Regions:
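P-loop NTPase motor domains
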Residues: 60-63, 67-73, 406-457, 510, ...
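Short glycine-biased active-site loop of nucleotidyltransferases that positions the nucleotide triphosphate
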Residues: 34, 119-120, 517-520, 738-744
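P-loop NTPase motor core of the ASCE superfamily
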Residues: 551-590, 741-838
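Glycine-rich phosphate-binding loop of nucleotide-binding enzymes
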Residues: 34, 47-49, 57-58, 63-71, ...
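Conserved P-loop NTPase motor cores
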Residues: 326, 455-456, 464-482, 487-492, ...
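Switch/coupling segment of Walker-type NTPase motor domains
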Residues: 49-55, 80-103, 107, 115-120, ...
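Phosphate-binding P-loop/Walker A region and its immediate neighborhood
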Residues: 97-98, 202-271, 385, 389-473, ...
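Extended, folded cores of ATP/NTP-driven motor/assembly subunits in large transport
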Residues: 1-416
Length: 838
């Protein structure tokens, strides 16, 4: 018998089809009452599993199975999986009061991102779980109530006592499931009302936000008309306008073998169904891939061990009888499938008796919507094909659309009962309807969106770690040209527009000056500080450290300048003594003073090294590092964004070993170390103590290769934590970072962009807290691939580890075209920047 015949035979008549439509009487937070029964409703959270290892999936599955069996037992339950879009107005409401009105124009930044949310049409998945709490009253009591109503004696639909009892039952379920990976919450009256309205033609009607919904308000919420057709339904609004077409497709066949995690997770398939659409533009007809969002409804109940054992034993006995009958009645071999069925049921019966497995009876429906019949057929084809690729077969449900549609209504019951499936607990809960992607801070500002099975705005605050007593360092790593520096600027700006803060961004390549333009665009004080002759001694280690700490830092810097073994010996043996003398004796100690002391030494080697250092101090970069100090430190202590640049820097490429660095490269790295240390020291000042402070340190991989580089980074990481100053690192080399356990321990966040070598990918995986594997390496490599055009490089896509150690894929995005142009490092954007600057 083929599938079509099975469906036709299955779609017969049964008593449940004749049930009257439900009469909804009251909705409140967590509860829905019909005339016959009460239901508890919960919103299901998202567990971040998209990037998790298989062991984490297994642990999550086991926990959910145990929790559901404990919380709901054999009660009739309903899962609703619904797709909508994130709305900019919801985002604006969530950040209301976050921006200091006396500081810049953070509200405009938030509005721009709200507009971006609407522009992107980000899909939002909502999963809700309903549990039938049982019949409200006995049959005679219901009949009496209907009789009284007919004679005009109208009582309140739900008494306070009944409401309280139902809430107690709901909270018992909540207590168990909230502590599970489902992380459920009582559904708000707004969420339940919205869920009901989706099955009517009133999708745009006002949804109550609080309180209870009953009487006329409830009637108004449900006021609509549904007209069934053989293979779809039409929905009309209260004005009798046709607003939507829907088709409810029952799932009639699952794969014979379900694995979890694996092919049991058909809910995940719903998140990635697409179709090809033709679009006319000025150049002719082109095609584009667009998503098809199909909802799903699953009605189910767990079966007790006794019921499940009886059912499986009956199936085993039937298979055994078939085998024996076939063996007696024919000389041919017994069909293989009969023997397999007997063996499989015997094995399952053993598992049930041991308590390791239970069964679930379920009926699954996929709901496809469209604004026209033509679009509906296209969407149905896309859904049917996508599920068919996973060996999941859906039927059109001919001549059953009315009953299938009613089934989707919360408060109704299973009507088409002959399409049920009996599955093991792993097979059913292996749908992982709670799995998705989640990352970031719920209350912070937006800088992109989480990209995975579930999609949501990515909200983060890299400058606020100290406020929760956390470590304060964040790492950005990836290949050049993949958007990591732009992402860093977006997150820095997102924090900076909230309230007065002090942010220093070192720009040694000269490509982040656009951040100052963006800051000024939103009325935030910002400036580019170009270090020059007037900043002599600005990067002096004596400016950055206390008298007790500075001598060692000066010694390390001078060791870096040594060009041969003799100078290195002097720097190692003598420079610390002279630096200590300078610290103890000079009124205003400086590296320049240390060099003068060395020049006055009686040791010829020390004199020769001092002469060399004096020559270096006369160069533009050398003057900033070790020249005679001036009062111009180059950095403002006022709140705002201060971008520090230095003309003439020569940064060594990764291919050049430290021993081959020339004098200019050594001085350049010394300048970076000195200015970074000075900025951190400045952040500890009394004037900045009460505000957020952030220092962004680029080219970390270069600093690590310098003399004492590892110790320097470890030191500034600890300084940042001590001074409650957030440190932001930018590097192309994950392996060198991973080799510093002290620095890794200070990381409260990691952003990894595309990397192409196995060593870098594995190091990045460990920094993210993921298991290095072929799958993880492929995921990191794919970050730079544009899914819509293989000829393009994807920019701004990263794997992000937040401070809760959640890891998800994030697409960083600009709030507006203006910000995109101002932050661009493309030479073609120069004109726009010049216009803004003027």
């Amino acid at each position: 018998m083929d599938v079509v015949e099975k469906v036709r035979n299955a779609l017969g008549f049964n008593a449940e089809r004749a049930l009257p439509t439900p009469v909804h009487q009251l909705i409140c937070d967590g509860l829905l009452f019909t005339e016959d029964h009460a239901e508890a409703w919960f919103t299901v959270g998202v567990q971040n599993l998209d990037t998790a290892a298989e062991a984490v999936w297994d642990e999550s599955l086991d926990s959910v199975k145990k929790s559901m069996l404990q919380a709901v037992g054999e009660s009739n339950c309903m899962i609703r999986i619904m797709w909508s879009e994130h709305r900019g107005e919801d985002y604006l409401r969530s950040v209301q009061g976050r921006y200091d009105a006396s500081w810049g124009n953070g509200a405009a930044w938030a509005r721009d991102y709200a507009s971006k949310i609407d522009e992107l049409h980000l899909p939002a998945r909502t999963v809700m779980l309903g549990v039938n709490l049982g019949e409200r009253t006995s049959g005679p009591a219901r009949l009496m109530r209907k009789t009284e109503k007919a004679f005009g004696f109208q009582h309140g639909p739900v008494s306070d006592a009944e409401l309280a009892d139902a809430m107690v039952a709901a909270r018992k379920i909540l207590k168990v499931l909230a502590a599970s990976p489902l992380a459920v919450e009582l559904a708000s009256v707004e969420a339940i009302s919205w869920m009901l309205s989706r099955e009517s033609g009133r999708a745009k009607a006002r949804i109550p936000a609080t309180g209870t919904v009953r009487g006329a308000a409830l009637g108004h919420l449900l006021a609509s008309k549904m007209v069934p057709h053989p293979d779809h339904v039409e929905l009309f609004d209260e004005h009798d306008n046709l607003v939507a077409f829907k088709a409810i497709l029952p799932i009639v066949s699952f794969p014979e073998e379900l694995t979890a995690p694996g092919n049991a997770d058909w809910v995940e398939v719903l998140s990635r169904i697409t179709k090809i659409r033709e679009v006319a533009d000025g150049y002719g007809i082109r095609t584009e891939e667009v998503p098809v969002r199909a909802d799903a409804t699953i009605r189910f109940n767990n079966l007790s061990r006794q019921s499940a054992g009886k059912m499986v034993n009956e199936a085993r006995r039937t298979a055994k009888e078939q085998r024996q009958s076939a063996a007696k009645g024919s000389a041919e071999e017994v069909p293989e499938e009969v023997e397999e069925a007997e063996t499989a049921n015997a094995r399952l019966l053993t598992q049930i008796k041991k308590g390791g497995t239970f069964l679930v009876e379920q009926s699954s429906r996929v709901i496809v919507s469209a604004s026209s019949l033509e679009e509906l057929e296209e969407n149905i084809d896309a859904v049917t094909h996508a599920l068919g690729e996973e060996d999941i077969i859906v039927a059109r449900g001919e001549n059953e659309q009315r009953d299938l549609w009613l089934e989707n209504l919360p408060g109704d019951a299973l009507r088409v009962t002959d399409l049920n499936h009996i599955q093991t607990d792993n097979g059913f809960y292996g749908t992982f309807f709670w799995a998705g992607s989640r990352c970031g801070d719920e209350q912070a500002g937006m800088s992109g969106f989480v990209h995975g099975t579930t999609v949501e705005p990515f909200r983060s605050s890299i400058s606020s770690a100290g406020e929760r007593g956390d470590t304060t360092s964040t790492l950005y790593s990836g290949r050049s040209g993949r958007g990591k520096t732009t992402a860093m600027m977006l997150e820095l700006l997102s924090d900076l527009v909230e309230r007065p803060a002090w942010t220093v961004l070192f720009d040694w390549k000269g490509d982040t000056g656009g951040a100052a333009l963006v800051a000024r665009h939103y009325k935030i004080p910002a400036s580019i500080v170009e270090l020059g002759e007037e900043h002599s001694g600005a990067a002096d280690m004596f400016r950055a450290f206390s008298r007790a700490q500075a001598p060692i830092a000066v010694q390390s810097m001078l060791m870096m300048q040594a060009k041969d073994r003799r100078q290195a010996d002097v720097a190692t043996s003598a420079s610390l003594r002279f630096a200590t003398e300078e610290a103890e004796e000079a009124e205003e100690p400086s590296t320049w003073g240390v060099i003068q002391r060395m020049a006055a030494s009686n040791d010829a080697d020390v004199q020769a090294f001092a002469a060399y250092l004096l020559d270096l101090a006369k160069t533009p970069i050398g003057r900033i590092v070790m020249g005679a100090p001036t009062a111009n430190a180059g950095l403002s202590s006022e709140p705002g964004l201060w971008i520090v640049q230095a003309a003439g820097l020569s940064l060594p490429s990764p291919e050049i070993s430290f021993s081959d660095w020339d004098a200019q490269q050594r001085l350049s790295v010394a300048l970076i170390q000195g200015m970074t240390s000075f900025a951190l020291g400045m952040s500890s000042s009394k004037a900045l103590r009460e505000m957020r402070k952030t220092v962004a340190v680029p080219e970390v991989h270069i600093l690590l290769r310098a003399t004492g580089g590892a110790a320097f980074l470890d030191q500034i990481a600890r300084m940042g934590r001590a001074f409650n100053t957030s440190l932001v690192y930018d590097t192309q080399d994950c392996t060198s970072i991973l080799s510093l356990p002290g620095l890794v321990e200070q990381l409260q966040g990691v952003r990894v962009f595309q990397l192409t070598t196995k060593a870098q990918q594995d190091a990045a995986a460990e920094l993210l807290g993921l298991e290095p594997s072929e799958q993880t390496r492929a995921r990191i490599l794919a970050l730079g691939r544009d899914e819509t055009d293989i000829r393009k490089v994807a920019k701004g896509r990263a794997l992000v580890r937040d401070w809760r150690d959640q890891v998800a894929e994030v697409q960083f995005t600009f709030p507006s075209r203006t910000v995109q142009e101002l932050l661009s490092t493309d030479p073609n954007a120069t004109k726009k920047k010049e216009e803004m600057e003027s």
